[in-house]
């Protein structure tokens, strides 16, 4: 994923080092030298956010994996984001949560995690982006920008939509999907 930041700040200032422009998402399966490889990537200083996205793991497994990832993220000054689960954000004391359109409502998520970061998927829709901005999402994500080899691409976004959205918001923008 690639992080775009418009000049200025979003609804609540989200400090983003301009040298750190990557929003990295975990693989579907954690195995082998994952933690060692993650540390090697994060130590480069190019990653702003790391999202733990583990759809097929139990809560107990996610907590165990999340504790290890959080430690690596903290050491490398990378924001640790949890996909879809504000309650897990609280359990792990992660930096925030990423919500898809079918996940929990941002208002409810804010009640659960307070002032932590909440980002919202907007697919390829300016209307969804406007709703997320109005709800005070700390960043908005568009995609997929490329087709996947592993799953069907439902929404295809383009640079054109990012340019349109940048004209009316200072909220940071993330390009996701197949990158």
What are these regions (language model features)?
Residues 150-151:
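EAL-family c-di-GMP phosphodiesterase catalytic domain
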Residues 1-4, 8-138, 154, 164, ...:
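Conserved N-terminal beta1-alpha1 strand-loop-helix module at the mouth
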Residues 147:
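Active-site micro-motifs of SAM-dependent methyltransferase domains
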Residues 161:
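Conserved cofactor-binding/catalytic machinery of classical short-chain dehydrogenase/reductase
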């Amino acid at each position: 994923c690639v992080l775009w930041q418009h000049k200025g700040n979003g609804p609540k200032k989200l400090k983003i080092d301009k040298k750190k422009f990557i929003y990295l998402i975990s693989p579907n399966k954690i195995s082998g030298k994952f933690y060692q490889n993650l540390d090697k990537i994060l130590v480069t200083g190019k990653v702003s956010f790391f999202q733990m996205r583990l759809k097929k793991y139990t809560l107990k497994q996610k907590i165990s994996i999340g504790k290890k990832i959080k430690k690596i993220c903290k050491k490398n000054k990378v924001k640790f984001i949890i996909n879809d689960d504000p309650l897990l954000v609280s359990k792990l004391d992660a930096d925030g949560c990423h919500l898809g359109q079918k996940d929990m409502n941002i208002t409810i998520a804010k009640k659960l995690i307070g002032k932590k970061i909440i980002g919202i998927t907007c697919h390829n829709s300016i209307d969804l982006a406007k709703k997320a901005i109005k709800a005070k999402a700390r960043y908005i994500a568009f995609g997929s920008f490329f087709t996947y080899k592993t799953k069907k691409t439902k929404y295809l976004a383009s640079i054109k939509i990012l340019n349109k959205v940048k004209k009316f918001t200072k909220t940071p923008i993330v390009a996701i999907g197949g990158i």
